[in-house]
Amino acid sequence: MSWLNIENSPNNFHLTMTAEEIIFKYYPKDNALRRLLLHHSHQVADMALAVADRHPELHLDRDFLYRASMLHDVGIFLTDAPAIHCFGKAPYLIHGRLGAELMREEGDEKTARVCERHTGTGLTAENIRTQNLPLPPGDYLPETLEEQVVCYADKFFSKSHPERTRTPEQVAKSLAKFGEAGVEKFWEWQRRFG
């Protein structure tokens, strides 16, 4: 089932469009959902940029870190998650994939990759198969340093509790229910980016 009808989506993106302009395009009303998305995205961006500041040896692309952090959750409006003001039809789990489709329609493959690879610490084809997840088969793992940093930073913030910043221990505990591999990946990132 297609949750996003790309054929009917406007395609007026030129690579000069800012992250905020894209958000306002898909979230035109100043409502609780847009405010929550902006708040969460700024939290993730602030942490991702702090990683770049702490680790100049990584030569991270700060402009892209900001853009990707702001847009990693752009697909949430298409999902059914009323507790965070999302009244779409798709399962929340696929918000990254939906955001990736939006970004591809906008002509932004680089940001699309971040959208579809930030769930947990990434999803493998094995995860999708064994857990019967509603995603196309494939590996959705953050590969570039920027993809990894955005995924890492996102784990510290929840849209359900936007006022809180999780500790690394809380992040690890939240990932444990999905398996030890994700916890190990997070601790690897914590050692590298923390």
Task: Go through each PLM region and give its residues.
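Charged phosphate-binding loop/patch that engages nucleotide di/tri-phosphates or the phosphate backbone
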Residues: L175-G194
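Alpha-helix initiation and N-capping motif
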Residues: T16-E20, D108, P168, V183
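Alpha-helical scaffold segments in carbohydrate-active enzymes
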Residues: M47-A50, K155, R192
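Charge-dense, low-complexity intrinsically disordered segments
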Residues: N31, R35-L38, E143, A176-E180
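A general alpha-helix detector
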Residues: I22-Y26, M47, L98-G99, Y152, ...
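Generic alpha-helical structural signal
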Residues: H42-D46, R97, W187
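Divalent metal-dependent catalytic cores for phosphoryl transfer on phosphate-bearing substrates
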Residues: E57-P168
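Acidic/His-rich, divalent-metal-binding segments that scaffold phosphate/diphosphate chemistry
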Residues: W3-Y92
